[in-house]
Amino acid sequence: MPFTPAVLNKRLSDLIVHEIDPSVGYNRRDINITPAAVQLGQVVFRAKSSDLTAAYAVLSAAAQLVDTNEFAIVGGDHYSFNPSFTPRTSATGQFNAVAIVGNGNAIQLKEYFVKQVAQDADGANLTDAQFETLRGLLEAAGIQLLKTL
């Protein structure tokens, strides 16, 4: 009997453990990301701002892990869930991605994809200690990262 390779299809449920009233999407927001390759669980950041249209950038270095920045975790493009994409150039009045922003409401995520992307040598290349700093910054925003076994 031939062996068939198992393919891991990424799903939003591979990221989100618990969200208060997911049909309403309290913790999700349309955002703009400076165009760059994005994956499920990608952390993006921007300087804290009340301007909801201010663009986020992909986290690329530990130096960006400061409490004067706000963070979000990407879950899809401007249409829907998408595990891997490059955002289109943003235009006035339009957004190019959907992200989990926290909003002070508790949302629980699995750390697996977030940690995998954050510690990738092609990404932010965070150490375990730096990832724990990221975990603390996300938790302050209401995003809890739960250990993945």
Question: What does each model-identified segment do?
Answer:
Residues 1-149:
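Surface-exposed, low-hydrophobicity beta-strand/loop segments enriched in small/polar/acidic residues
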